[in-house]
Amino acid sequence: MITPWKKISSKPVGDFRIFKLRSDLCINPRTGKEHDFYVLDSVNWVNVIALTPNQQLVMVQQFRHGSGTVELEIPGGMMDPHETDPVATAVRELREETGYEGEQARLLGKIHSNPAILSNTTFTVLIENCRLQHAVEFDSGEDLNTLLVPVADIPQLVADEKIGHSLVVVALSYFDLWQRGIKKV
C-alpha cells in the first residue's frame, strides 16, 4: 500500500500571476531519503459542457501559447480568487466567452488537473438548453471564435486529434458517461 510522503518543509520559489511555484522537501516513506518537489499552485479551473436544444456543443477555437497551436475546446477558465462555486463560475465563463446562457447548470465531475505538479482541481459543469443571449465579453488577453459542433461529431474529432486539450477530452468523457447513463448528476 502506498503511504503519503511526509512534508518536512515548504517554501515559495516564485509568483507568476496565474500560478505560484513552491518547493516541498519530503521524505520517501520507503527509503527514508529526502527529496525536493516543485509544485505549481493555481486557482481552480472550470470547463463547460454547453449543450444546445439541437444537440450541439458550444465550442471555441483559440490560440494556445504553450503548444503554439489553435485548439478546438469547450469554454472554460480560471476561477477568480473570490469564487468558491464552480457552477457559478462556469455560467459566467460561458456568458463572457460565447454570449450563451442555458439552464440546469450542474457539476458533472472534477479531476486533479495534473497531480504530479499542480495543486488545483478542474471542474466540469454541464449546462443544458444553451442559446445565444449576449455579446461576448473578452478580457484583453482573449481572442476566441465560437462555433456549434454536433454532439455526434465529438468522438471522431477526439479520435482524429482535432480536439487535443487533455482537460477538454476528460470533460467530454464525463459528458459521454452522463449521456450513456453511467455518470449520474
Where are these regions (language model features)?
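Conserved Nudix-box catalytic region and its N-terminal flanking loop in Nudix hydrolases
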Residues: 2, 37, 47-92, 138-140
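Nudix hydrolase/Nudix homology domain
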Residues: 2-5, 33, 70, 116-118, ...
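Acidic, metal-coordinating catalytic segment for phosphate/diphosphate chemistry
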Residues: 11-47, 53
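Short, solvent-exposed loop/turn elements at beta->coil junctions and helix N-caps
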Residues: 11-12, 109-114
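Active-site-adjacent beta-strand/loop module that shapes the phosphate/pyrophosphate-binding cleft
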Residues: 25-30, 114-133
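A short coil-to-beta-strand element that immediately follows conserved catalytic motifs
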Residues: 101-108
